[in-house]
């Protein structure tokens, strides 16, 4: 290194500029080995397969409309794009369920972080809740959304 600096300072100013131009070309990132690179996942991985339905259950003719997504593994020491996907899905806190639509754009994001999350179908045994009953719903660990009916007090007739 000292020999390189000595040769730079002993040369005339015109030659110093050519050395600077050569140094600027080394600043580019073409020669750096990047630690993380996006994996090249083939498209056939994202296509539905009949054996998946047999393995995990479910009906391909009538798929469920909503997913319950829960993060079960940490994002420490994971690549930045997985952390960004977890943040987009709202799964920063572990073991807190989030509900997402079963649509291709969301499913593509879930495939990227499928090793960090658990996906369950949302079951609605009592049907979709209305706006009034939304506050009295309970999400069970089995994936059922139960509407808890509030009991109204029975009015007693006045005794005379």
From Swiss-Prot:
Protein's recorded name: Large ribosomal subunit protein uL30m
Q: Which key words tag this protein in UniProt?
A: Mitochondrion, Ribonucleoprotein, Ribosomal protein, Transit peptide
Q: Which GO terms describe its molecular function?
A: structural constituent of ribosome
Record text on subunit structure and interactions: Component of the mitochondrial ribosome large subunit (39S) which comprises a 16S rRNA and about 50 distinct proteins.
Q: Where is this region: Disordered?
A: 45-64
Record's InterPro entries?
Answer: Ribo_uL30_ferredoxin-like_sf, Ribosomal_uL30_bac-type, Ribosomal_uL30_ferredoxin-like
> Its GO biological process terms?
translation
Subcellular location(s) per record? Mitochondrion
Range annotated as the organelle transit peptide: 1-34
Task: Identify the domain of life.
Answer: Eukaryota
Q: Which family does it belong to?
A: Belongs to the universal ribosomal protein uL30 family.
Species name: Rattus norvegicus (Rat)
Q: Name one GO cellular component term.
A: mitochondrial large ribosomal subunit
Fetch the Pfam families from UniProt: Ribosomal_L30
